[in-house]
Amino acid sequence: MKPIKAITFSQASKATGFPLIELLVVVAIIGILSAVGIFAYSGYVSSSEKKAAENTIRQISLAQTEYYSDNQNYWRNTNATNCTPSSSTSGTIVSQLMGGKSILNNDTAFEMCVALDNVDNGFIIQARHKSSSCVLTFRSSTTAITASNCS
């Protein structure tokens, strides 16, 4: 009978696998890539919200043109020459100017209002982001949308 060889510690621990440092490097790389991805995604979201608000402003402008052809004056939320966008003014635009056709729903990130523009007897549409200081302004005299405090 052959004698049993004793297994030494160095022979027993020769298991193959990834060292801890390699696993930590992989986890760090995945963390960095996900942080960059989340930052880029939030930029895409805010950009798409702004574009959606610009399209809504253009729809309101077209409704204003139709309202003017029927009434010989522009519809507005207030008799003042400026307004403060809110959920109330947005709802009034939908119910009175748009005839109940909801272009401003709960998913819209901006609140809107319409005021008269005394400079050219036209109108101004303002849109303010609900959770940031971004404000979009449309003037009927220039038909341009200007942005302030928007990233």
Locate the predicted segments by residue.
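Membrane-proximal amphipathic alpha-helices
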Residues: 42-57
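Generic N-terminal leader/processing signal
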Residues: 3, 12, 48-49, 124-128, ...
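N-terminal single-pass transmembrane signal-anchor helix
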Residues: 13-41, 45
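N-terminal leader/signal peptides at the extreme start of proteins
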Residues: 1-18
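Periplasmic/extracellular, small/polar-rich flexible segments of pilin-like filament-forming proteins
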Residues: 62, 66-151
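Conserved catalytic core of two-component sensor histidine kinases
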Residues: 27, 54, 61
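Enrichment for repetitive, rod-forming helical segments
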Residues: 9-12, 31, 37, 57-58, ...
